[in-house]
């Protein structure tokens, strides 16, 4: 996809339309209409609808892995890194709710087929990053060694991702408060 600012605008519009109508029901014309542009003009920036899906998913997954990597590289204690990971995940969700919704509701095999990068590998890298922080916490003595952290990471990501189903900005609770509550729940469950 060409031109960064326009790319972002197109991806955001595509995410809104696809989240509302579903990937299969969305036509390029629907996205062009949402952008108030001609369908032919949209094709200047994209090749196919699959190109849009690929862009949406890869962007979210790459941001997730990058943010987690930045947290891993800090000198913080593992418990603080976990708190920051929860906050980062929910902030990314909050700022990209439509694209996040597509990632969570569309068929991952379809997503992986359209992706130049392996979407499943990016997801595994993200889980591995969390697991590495928990292992660091076990080694430092901050976290209990009696836990199966592979299962815990899957549970945490399930909890954080399920936020997509119930969280609404208008409900009155800031996403930062949700993050604080979730981080407390997680850390109380794993600390020694």
Residue ranges and their predicted role:
Residues 98-105, 120, 138-185:
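Hydrophobic/aromatic-rich alpha-helical bundle segments in the mid-to-C-terminal region
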Residues 55, 69-95, 153-156:
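Hydrophobic alpha-helical connector segments
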Residues 62-65, 69, 95, 114-140, ...:
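Amphipathic alpha-helical packing segments from all-alpha helical-bundle domains
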Residues 1-5:
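N-terminal intrinsically disordered/low-complexity leader segments
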Residues 46, 105-111:
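Short helix-capping/turn signature of helix-turn-helix
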Residues 9, 17-51, 55:
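Helix-turn-helix
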Residues 10, 14-18, 64, 89, ...:
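Short hydrophobic clusters on alpha-helical segments that form packing/core surfaces
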Residues 20-24, 74-75, 96, 140:
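Short coil/turn segments at alpha/beta junctions that flank glycine-rich nucleotide-binding fingerprints
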């Amino acid at each position: 996809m060409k031109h960064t600012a326009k790319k972002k605008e197109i991806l955001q519009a595509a995410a809104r339309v696809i989240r509302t109508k579903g990937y299969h029901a969305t036509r390029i014309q629907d996205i062009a209409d949402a952008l108030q542009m001609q369908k032919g003009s949209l094709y200047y920036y994209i090749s196919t609808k699959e190109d849009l899906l690929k862009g949406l998913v890869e962007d979210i997954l790459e941001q997730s892995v990058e943010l987690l990597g930045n947290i891993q590289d800090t000198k913080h204690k593992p418990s603080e890194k976990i708190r920051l990971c929860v906050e980062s995940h929910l902030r990314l969700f909050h700022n990209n709710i439509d694209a996040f919704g597509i990632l969570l509701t569309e068929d991952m095999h379809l997503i992986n087929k359209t992706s130049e990068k392996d979407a499943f590998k990016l997801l595994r890298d993200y889980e591995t990053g969390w697991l590495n922080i928990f292992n660091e916490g076990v080694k430092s003595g901050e976290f209990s060694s009696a836990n199966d952290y592979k299962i815990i990471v899957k549970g945490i990501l399930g909890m954080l991702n399920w936020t997509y189903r119930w969280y609404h900005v208008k409900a009155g609770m800031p996403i930062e408060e949700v993050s604080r509550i979730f981080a407390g729940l997680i850390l109380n469950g794993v600390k020694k």
